């Protein structure tokens, strides 16, 4: 599809990552690493594709109310009980779609939704060390809540 977009002089590639691709996520190291790779790929392709008239966006959603949000397992333990203890409920799919499409229409490179995920990303960019300490405390809470192990 890239050659066709290049030949026509325009196009828009949209990749899906996660807020975990921008902010390290406790007890989800492999998932977080894979999503960081999607973000890096997208940002690199964005720089390369611009001269061909091709835009690239990467979607980095927080917890969206999809089956995945209700079935994701943390390393060494389940997810049961985690969603109900989060500061805010999973974001509605319909609203997520609206915000994603608005970001694509504005040709944003990185689209972070909902606002809570965006706040988390801003906090991480401002102070990675402070977020590391918060993440370290979150590990204990998640392990206790889910029975996740330390490996």
What does each of the following model-derived ranges do?
Residues 37, 41-49, 59, 68:
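Hydrophobic alpha-helix immediately C-terminal to the catalytic Tyr-X-X-X-Lys motif of short-chain
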Residues 108-141:
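A transmembrane-helix-recognition feature enriched in membrane-embedded lipid enzymes
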Residues 23-29:
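Active-site loop immediately N-terminal to the catalytic Tyr-X3-Lys motif
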Residues 51-115:
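SDR active-site lid
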Residues 34:
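Active-site helix of classical SDR
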Residues 1-9:
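A short helix-coil junction within the Rossmann-fold of NAD(P)-dependent oxidoreductases
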Residues 18:
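Residue(s) in the substrate-gating loop at a strand-loop-helix junction
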Residues 4-5, 23, 44-54:
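Active-site-adjacent segment of SDR/Rossmann-fold oxidoreductases
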